[in-house]
Structure formats: C-alpha cells, structure tokens
Regions:
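A conserved acidic, glycine/proline-rich C-terminal tail/linker
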Residues: 202-226
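Catalytic-core "active-site belt" of small-molecule-metabolizing enzymes
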Residues: 2-201, 207, 215
Length: 226
C-alpha cells in the first residue's frame, strides 16, 4: 500500500474524529480489503493522543459477517472522550447508522501480565464489573450503508459514542440468550433483539477482543472496558 496515501487518508480521518467533522468518503481500497482497513485503523489510532479506556468488537452480528463474506469481526480502541454516562445527550448526523444495545465488561489490568491462553474457563477471573451500554454507530464520512466490513473498521470502528449504564459486580450468569429491546421515548418505537446476536454471546465477543489485544502486545497498565 502507498504509505503517502495511507498517511494522507489517516490524517483526514483523525482530523474528522478529533474535531467532529465530516469528510468525503475515503477510497474504496481501504474498505474492500479488511487487512487494509485494519492497517488504516491502527494508523489512525496511533495519531490520537486521547486516553484509551478500552476496546470494542465490531461487526459481531453473524448474519452481517455471512453477508459480507468475512470470517471474523474486528476490534478497535475506545477513547475517554467517546464514553458518556447514561442520561447524557449525543449530537448525531444523517450518517449515523444506528444505535446498538451492548454489554460491556470492566477488565482487571493484571490481564496484561497473564501468560495464560484466554478461554471461557479462565476469562471470568479477569472481570470485575459489567454494565449495559448503548453504542451510537456511524461514520465521519458522507456515506451511508455498509458494503464492506472495512467500511466500519477503517473509520475508528464506526464508533461515535458509548453511553454506559450503572456498573454491577460481575456474576456468572447466563446472558447468552436474553431478549432485549431499545425504546424511542419520543415516537414509542421499539426495536427488539437478543444477546445471542453478538458473536454467539457477549462473553465470546469479549474473548475475541482479549485474544486480539494480547496478540498485538497492547498494555494499558490499568483496568479497561470491553
């Protein structure tokens, strides 16, 4: 890939991200190939000086992965300025794709020192708390829809904001098949869902992200969210 173009496009996305601006759509080659998308994402993230408070999984809906012919989701960094407490207002634009109901976990910083292979059998010892959250998903580009998984991945994981609810101490409960709904209080519209849509279940999605950040040798040296 042309390093000069990579640097130019990443600078434009970073400027849009930090200054809450919109830019014209980036070249398709950065979206069509997920490897190029991840490279652009990492390049953009390396230029952000805001504190990282955690990571997110993106493209975890199995029907979406199948439709886009991708084998797995992606992950991206979440910054302090993009996390709001429940009840705060978020300004959106016409390029917002939607709102997703999520489960987030607070992970102990000693995870970064662990040499163990991450699995369902040992993952829970690293979790301190869990909380419901809403993710506002969208672009910093003037484009709509999702043609490639890289559309989401390349643009800071398509994360606009996270709204986090009240944290509770983690308990080993089965949340792999729970019905959910999001209600619009203004028009009374309700959108139904199920936790099983999140890469089989939320814990499976969590394990996916933890394996990726361990592979990439990331160490925040503090507790963090996923």
């Amino acid at each position: 890939m042309n390093k000069k173009q990579l640097n130019t496009i990443s600078n434009k996305l970073v400027n849009a991200f930090t200054k809450n601006k919109l830019i014209k759509p980036i070249p398709t080659k950065f979206c069509k190939n997920i490897k190029n998308s991840n490279l652009l994402r990492r390049t953009c993230e390396s230029k952000i000086r805001w504190p990282i408070i955690g990571f997110k999984a993106g493209g975890t809906a199995l029907p979406l992965l199948k439709k886009l012919k991708e084998k797995e989701p992606f992950y991206g960094s979440v910054y302090s300025k993009n996390l709001l407490r429940s009840g705060k207002r978020v300004k959106i634009n016409q390029y917002v794709l939607g709102i997703e109901l999520e489960v987030c976990y607070l992970i102990k910083k000693n995870f970064f020192l662990s040499k163990q292979k991450i699995s369902k059998n040992n993952i829970t010892k690293f979790i301190t708390h869990m909380a419901p959250c809403l993710e506002i998903v969208g672009y910093r580009q003037r484009k709509k829809g999702v043609k490639y998984l890289g559309d989401l991945c390349s643009d800071f994981g398509a994360n606009i904001k996270f709204l986090i609810g009240k944290k509770t101490k983690f308990k080993k409960i089965n949340i792999g098949n729970l019905n959910t709904y999001v209600k619009n209080n203004k028009n009374k519209e309700i959108t139904n869902g199920n936790t099983s849509a999140v890469y089989i279940n939320p814990l499976n999605s969590l394990i996916f992200v933890l394996k990726k950040i361990k592979r990439d040798k990331i160490n925040l040296n503090k507790n963090f969210y996923i």
